[in-house]
Amino acid sequence: MSVTLHTNLGDIKIELFCESVPRTAENFLALCASGQYDGTLFHRNIRGFMIQGGDPTGTGKGGQSIWGRPFSDEIRQTLRFNNRGMVAMANAGPDTNKSQFFITYAKQPSLDGKYSIFGKVIDGMETLDSMEKTPVNPKSRPLQEIKLLNVTVHANPIADQAKGGLA
């Protein structure tokens, strides 16, 4: 199961961990498939740490889950921030996941157990490199827009299962 984030700097393909974190994957996939992420900005960019997006307001304060309220963390000991390109839900504390997500630029072991990891970058590291090199203001907001144009969902087992198809 994978998606491709089409950005103005290039594409990033992400493998999703649907079996390990089904609720988080369902939320992300549904937001992708419904176009909720289309045209949104990556509003926070910290070199050596991560880039954050998924807020339709572009402020870092907006966004909502598909259930209309925050949902619980899915922390798994087998999923760790042990590589560049790990993808996780951004939150404001335990069990406050909505629509915002981030992609790491490096190993971040201090984040383990605090954020629901739901995927990893499997193609497009050069795009991630370009994002990381984008200059930012003192509040870590990119000086040049980094925009998520749209998302391609390559296979959606959750939707297929709901339609009675093969999972």
Swiss-Prot record:
Gene Ontology terms: biological process: protein folding
GO cellular component: catalytic step 2 spliceosome
EC number(s) stated in the UniProt entry for this protein: 5.2.1.8
Keywords: Isomerase, Rotamase
InterPro entries, A to Z: Cyclophilin-like_dom_sf, Cyclophilin-type_PPIase, Cyclophilin-type_PPIase_CS, Cyclophilin-type_PPIase_dom, Cyclophilin_A-like
Positions in coiled-coil regions: none
Pfam family, one: Pro_isomerase
PPIase cyclophilin-type domain residues: 1-153
Top-tier EC class: isomerase
Matching PANTHER family: PEPTIDYL-PROLYL CIS-TRANS ISOMERASE-LIKE 3, PEPTIDYL-PROLYL CIS-TRANS ISOMERASE-RELATED
Role of this protein: PPIases accelerate the folding of proteins. It catalyzes the cis-trans isomerization of proline imidic peptide bonds in oligopeptides.
Family: Belongs to the cyclophilin-type PPIase family. PPIL3 subfamily.
Designated name of the protein: Peptidyl-prolyl cis-trans isomerase-like 3
Organism: Cryptococcus neoformans var. neoformans serotype D (strain JEC21 / ATCC MYA-565) (Filobasidiella neoformans)
